[in-house]
């Protein structure tokens, strides 16, 4: 299981490691089928219903700690087949409301990515596109997203430029979040099919992405150089639901 701490191991085995009771509860709620559950005996006695989700193995607390990436696991880890990337854009003619896509350019911090994914689910984002950056299936992202990543449609691109080109041809407006100089986000028509681009924590968005987009910003005091990417995303994504 320790090989699943790394992207190479996850790719080779096509498995992800779920750590903790909450993620297993999410599997139960979403009717996902883990392939294996490993838990301590104490955890098994407390959660007999969750143990019915998959083949199970009782291990010592020491062995469980070796399996997990966290220092103090809560007594259980499980294996789940890695969800597949989506293959197409939302159909505009079939959508009940204009689709909203979030495209993330090289977001590196797993905590930020997990928060972005959780916020995307709360805001009703239809798809999340990832152009490099942190692996959405690493344990830190899974925990930070509180399992939201298991419910989202994800697409990983070698470069977001190709995806943005396809979206423009499909009548999506392209919105690029920048620190300053953009249109205030509340002036944007969020009722149009939209792709919101957010960039790397330090470098921001690649120039080839901003060149193809309308610039939008979250106005803030000059004493603060920039907002955390997840904070800015939350404000803009929730604007659509006002």
Report each predicted region and the residues it spans:
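Short beta->alpha connector loops at strand-helix junctions that form conserved
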Residues: 59-62, 105, 131-132, 153, ...
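Glycine/small-residue-rich loop that forms an oxyanion/phosphate-binding "nest" at active or ligand-binding sites
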Residues: 53-81
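RNA substrate-binding interface of SAM-dependent RNA methyltransferases
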Residues: 29, 84-181
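Short, glycine/polar-rich helix-capping loops at beta-to-alpha or helix-loop-helix junctions
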Residues: 46, 134-141, 203-208
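Active-site/ligand-binding-proximal alpha/beta "capping" segment
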Residues: 175-224
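Boundary-proximal intrinsically disordered activation/regulatory segments immediately upstream
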Residues: 1-44, 133-134
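Structured adenosyl-cofactor binding patch, chiefly the S-adenosyl-L-methionine
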Residues: 78, 119-123, 141-149, 207-242
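Amphipathic alpha-helical repeat scaffolds
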Residues: 20, 108-115, 226-232
